[in-house]
Curated annotation (Swiss-Prot):
Pfam families: Toxin_12
Keywords: Amidation, Disulfide bond, Ion channel impairing toxin, Knottin, Secreted, Signal, Toxin
Protein source organism: Chilobrachys guangxiensis
Free-text function comment from the UniProt entry: Probable ion channel inhibitor.
Tissue expression notes: Expressed by the venom gland.
Disulfide partners: 49-63, 56-68, 62-76
Taxon lineage: Eukaryota, Metazoa, Ecdysozoa, Arthropoda, Chelicerata
Official protein name in the record: U21-theraphotoxin-Cg1b
Domain observations: The presence of a 'disulfide through disulfide knot' structurally defines this protein as a knottin.
GO molecular function terms listed in the Swiss-Prot or TrEMBL record: ion channel inhibitor activity; toxin activity
Residues with the Phenylalanine amide modification: 82
GO CC, any one term: extracellular region
Highest taxon of source: Eukaryota
Family assignment from sequence similarity: Belongs to the neurotoxin 10 (Hwtx-1) family. 05 (F4a) subfamily.
Proregion span(s): 22-47
Amino acid sequence: MKVSVLITLAVLGVMFLLTSAEERGSDQMDSPAWLKSMERIFQSEERECRWLFGGCEKDSDCCEHLGCRRAKPSWCGWDFTFGK
């Protein structure tokens, strides 16, 4: 019973997405501007510091309150400090 309800909800969701895409028109979906906007979403962002579990070589690579853990592979972990 639960499986059939989940399958029904999934099918309805897919149908909703397809009909909303058709309403917008295929010319909008094929436009280069749309493709460029999607490209920007998936490009990696260069940051000044590494976030939690990000790769690092030294403590200064990591963001505030994080330190470089030198276990293989090296990663940024919490340095047990607090602040604003």
